[in-house]
Curated annotation (Swiss-Prot):
Keyword annotations from UniProtKB, A to Z: Cell inner membrane, Cell membrane, Membrane, Protein transport, Translocation, Transmembrane, Transmembrane helix, Transport
Source organism phylogeny: Bacteria, Pseudomonadati, Pseudomonadota, Betaproteobacteria, Neisseriales
GO molecular function, one term: protein transmembrane transporter activity
Compartments, as annotated in UniProt: Cell inner membrane
The organism of origin for this protein: Neisseria meningitidis serogroup B (strain ATCC BAA-335 / MC58)
Protein name: Sec-independent protein translocase protein TatA
InterPro entries, per database record: TatA/B/E, TatA/E
Gene that encodes it: tatA
Amino acid sequence: MGSFSLTHWIIVLIIVVLIFGTKKLRNVGKDLGGAVHDFKQGLNEGTDGKEAQKDDVIEHKKDEDKA
């Protein structure tokens, strides 16, 4: 009794579509997808900066060794 069956989820989905409409749900999906994309892009930019700093440190050490 604690878990929902497939028919329960279908009924819930139909009720949600009737209440909000497909256009509003589509907009929510686009907004959520954009937020996830921006979040992942921000994470990638953060790691790129760290890798660039490591490369700079390595190059700086090589320059010191040559001098």
